[in-house]
Amino acid sequence: MTSHPRDTPQFYLTAPSPCPYLPGQEERKVFTHLVGRRARDLNEILTQGGFRRSQTIAYRPACETCRACVSVRVVVEDFAITGSQRRILQRNAELIGTPEPNRPASEQYALFRRYLDARHGDGGMVDMTVLDYAMMIEDSHVDTHLVVYRERGPDSAIHGRGVGAPVAVCLTDVLADGLSMVYSFYDPDEASRSLGTYMILDHIRRARALGLPYLYLGYWVGGSRKMDYKAKFKPQERLMPQGWVRVE
């Protein structure tokens, strides 16, 4: 087990492994533990510096020969919705997203498993057990919660919640300058609803309602079809060597 002081971040470098996004490339990551009294502050600083959170770990790519992974964040106040994105919102008008504590549930894991098997059957997460899922959701020392999307029911106007099994779920961190979508998944049988795009659009609305300037989407990877969608939310800022650069 790696030992580390509780309030002083120590950074480590992973061994090379096959890149999950670009064939023929190897990835390495630099990471640190988000623990102790300063975990929340450290997560804020590192996210603004291009890191991503996974449980109590913050990491960013540190590949030797490739710089394709670029951290992106949507400029919420200036976001310009496209016609196709507006239609996606209309298509999912009967969904209600409810913020809930970051506690795992069996119905979440059932949806998560179906999503992985259908969309990422060859990915590194495909063997995650229910315990692994619980750790992904619960294991955190930062301000985080779930947004669980369900269909609108007859009493939803009264209590503000959807009914039935979840259609989509997002684990969301709350930062001083924005929301960060840590991980999201959805019903693979509802592909025509573009639920991944819908959750991003909904989180843009949530960030705006909270008065937060950014929505952090993680890494856009040029040349990766899996990550192309992140370039469709503009204006956005991309973290370059000179700092955050606006892209219209």
Curated annotation (Swiss-Prot):
Annotated function: Functions in the N-end rule pathway of protein degradation where it conjugates Leu from its aminoacyl-tRNA to the N-termini of proteins containing an N-terminal aspartate or glutamate.
Example of a GO biological process term: ubiquitin-dependent protein catabolic process via the N-end rule pathway
Enzymatic reactions: N-terminal L-glutamyl-[protein] + L-leucyl-tRNA(Leu) = N-terminal L-leucyl-L-glutamyl-[protein] + tRNA(Leu) + H(+); N-terminal L-aspartyl-[protein] + L-leucyl-tRNA(Leu) = N-terminal L-leucyl-L-aspartyl-[protein] + tRNA(Leu) + H(+)
Example GO molecular function: arginyl-tRNA--protein transferase activity
Keywords: Acyltransferase, Cytoplasm, Transferase
Entry annotated with the keyword Nucleotide-binding: no
Subcellular location, record wording: Cytoplasm
Protein's UniProt name: Aspartate/glutamate leucyltransferase
EC number: 2.3.2.29
Species in which this protein is naturally found: Methylorubrum extorquens (strain PA1) (Methylobacterium extorquens)
Source species, domain of life: Bacteria
A cellular component annotation (GO) from this entry: cytoplasm
